[in-house]
């Protein structure tokens, strides 16, 4: 339930109950992610898209490769497993760093185009499933987390997209951190 609160003379909205999972709300984000990333990254020079935050961290380029890999090996594959096998068969362990090999020789634009094409295919497939509430409650078996529901998996897919969009903008923002003089202390994004 949304409610208004007041502090220091300002009104702000809180969402203490958070959103309940909804396929429609998920589609609103999942359908937009490729366009958001295309608009943000397409045509930018390497200075913006190749730096990362240190060992075992992703550059914006790496994130797009990671998203491509996830579209091929995670969300749809695990959904099929849940719907077909329930929690009788364990998901394959996900390789968070597979994109390093899979992205070799590809430009950022190629990865953005590949991500957009695969995501579009996956969304057509997901929507054609006509999933019910009962389907969303079906369980699968994660190799680390144990029993998870399809609802958990699909909500995680949305948060995964949003997390990586935030990661990309954070890594890009840090490119100008030293050029900001004294202002970095006012920008929390630079301290993650």
Predicted regions and their residues:
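Surface-exposed helix-capping loop/turn segments at secondary-structure junctions
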Residues: 42-50, 127-136, 172-177
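A generic structural signal for well-ordered alpha-helical segments enriched in polar/charged residues
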Residues: 35, 39, 43, 81, ...
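Short, contiguous alpha-helical
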Residues: 1-16, 50-94, 140-192
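Acidic/histidine-rich alpha-helical segments that form the ligand environment
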Residues: 96-137, 152-160, 167
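Amphipathic, non-membrane alpha-helical segments in soluble helical-bundle scaffolds
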Residues: 20-30, 57, 108-112, 151-154
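Alpha-helical bundle segments that constitute or directly flank the non-heme di-iron/ferroxidase center
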Residues: 16-48, 70-81
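Helix N-cap and loop-to-helix transition residues
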Residues: 22, 45, 59, 95, ...
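A short, mixed-charge helix-start or loop-turn motif at secondary-structure junctions
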Residues: 15-23, 101-108, 143-150
